[in-house]
């Protein structure tokens, strides 16, 4: 069984697409991901540990709590898939890719051609750079089954 961490943008259903496509192909994969509820992710620190007057400390508390899950999941992953969306700059996704690279994890990056130049260093650390979820699932199927179908 492969353990895969799904990092990246949280504004589309790309994770569910990959999970469902892999299920349809009966691929033996376990998936994990960050907290994708944006409001909960942003506010967990102050909701759990108390309010902050300055936004920096609010964000710091939330990021620190969220990093507990992220670090564990990336360390446990065989492959880290990082999706960069079209609308927002996903700094945390780039950080996850760097952390995964530092741990010598296999990385698959997803982004459109428009972001190629901005992500060239991230792409250089990746084992594969895909344009969409379908290409990712084909990679996973090939890795697990040796099949190109």
Report the location of each language-model feature.
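Conserved catalytic or regulatory cores that recognize and/or transform ribose-phosphate-containing ligands
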Residues: 1-149
């Amino acid at each position: 069984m492969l353990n895969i961490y799904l990092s990246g943008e949280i504004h589309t259903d790309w994770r569910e697409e990959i999970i469902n496509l892999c299920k349809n192909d009966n691929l033996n994969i376990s998936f994990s991901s960050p907290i994708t509820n944006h409001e909960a992710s942003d506010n967990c620190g102050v909701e759990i540990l108390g309010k902050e007057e300055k936004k920096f400390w609010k964000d710091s508390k939330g990021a620190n709590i969220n990093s507990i899950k992220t670090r564990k999941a990336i360390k446990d992953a065989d492959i880290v898939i990082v999706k960069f969306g079209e609308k927002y700059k996903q700094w945390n996704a780039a950080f996850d890719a760097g952390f995964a690279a530092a741990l010598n994890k296999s990385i698959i990056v997803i982004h459109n051609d428009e972001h190629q130049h901005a992500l060239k260093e991230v792409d250089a650390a990746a084992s594969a750079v895909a344009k969409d979820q379908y290409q990712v699932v084909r990679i996973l199927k090939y890795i697990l089954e040796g099949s190109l179908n």
